[in-house]
UniProtKB/Swiss-Prot annotation:
Component of a transcriptional repressor complex together with MAX. In complex with MAX binds to the core DNA sequence 5'-CAC[GA]TG-3'. Antagonizes MYC transcriptional activity by competing with MYC for MAX binding. Binds to the TERT promoter and represses telomerase expression, possibly by interfering with MYC binding. This is Max dimerization protein 1. Residues 55-107 form the bHLH domain. CDD domains: bHLHzip_Mad1. The gene is mxd1. Heterodimer with MAX; the interaction is required for DNA-binding. DNA binding requires dimerization with another bHLH protein; does not form homodimers, and does not bind to DNA in the absence of MAX in vitro. One of its GO terms (cellular component) is nucleus. Residues 29-67, 178-221 are annotated as: Disordered. It comes from Xenopus laevis (African clawed frog). GO terms for biological process: negative regulation of transcription by RNA polymerase II; regulation of transcription by RNA polymerase II.
């Protein structure tokens, strides 16, 4: 009973190795039809390990080459960004990185100051905006008060003009009446003077006639 179980386990192991080998061969682009014995299998494993190690070394070398090329490119760009002074060619990678660190710190400080100034300017802008709105409301109120006062002033001016016109008319009527009354009084005075004069003339002529009648001698003379 134990022998068949061992045989089955061995067959399963060989089948598993066969499938694993086929998968590896499929990955590398070649296939084998028959299973190998243990020696051949060990030789293939060593060869595959050596191939893997060589391929991994070449891959690592290629990656390292690309990494160094990228690092050189980044260092050249960093030299253009960081102020190094007149002796920029003599700087090592370490000194370049240290200067870059200091430059970054300086830029961060400048950025903080700029942010603080921006916030302060924004606060001042909000304050000035509120002041401007307040002045606008105050100006509107003053304009309305000024327009009301000007309308009241114009109404009072019109009333004063009406009063002046009425007083002028009254004075004109007074002057006309006084002039007419004075002319009438002058006319009456002249008429009375004329009547008096006529009365005096009449009386003098009567007296003369009476005297002549009483003294006929004077008539003869």
């Amino acid at each position: 009973m134990a022998a068949p179980v061992c045989v089955n386990i061995q067959m399963l192991l060989e089948a598993a190795e066969y499938l694993e080998r086929r998968e590896r061969e499929a990955e590398h682009g070649y296939a084998s039809m028959l299973p190998y014995n243990s020696k051949e299998r060990d030789g293939l494993k060593r060869k595959s390990k050596s191939k893997k190690s060589s391929s991994s070394r070449s891959t690592h070398n290629e990656m390292e080459k690309n990494r160094r090329a990228h690092l050189r490119l980044c260092l050249e760009k960093l030299k253009m960004l960081v102020p190094l002074g007149p002796e920029s060619n003599r700087h090592t990678t370490l000194s370049l990185l240290m200067r870059a660190k200091l430059h970054i710190k300086k830029l961060e400080d400048c950025d903080k100051r700029s942010v603080h100034q921006i916030e302060q300017l924004q606060r001042e802008q909000r304050h000035l905006t509120r002041q401007l709105e307040k002045f606008g409301v105050e100006r509107t109120r003053m304009d309305s008060i000024g327009s009301a006062m000007s309308s009241e002033r114009s109404d009072s001016d019109r009333e004063e003009i009406d009063v002046d016109v009425e007083s002028t008319d009254y004075l004109t009527a007074e002057l006309d009446w006084s002039s007419s009354s004075s002319s009438v009084s002058d006319l009456d005075e002249r008429e009375s003077m004329q009547s008096i004069c006529s009365d005096e003339g009449y009386s003098s002529s009567g007296l003369k006639s009476i005297g002549l009648q009483n003294n006929p001698k004077s008539i003869a003379l």
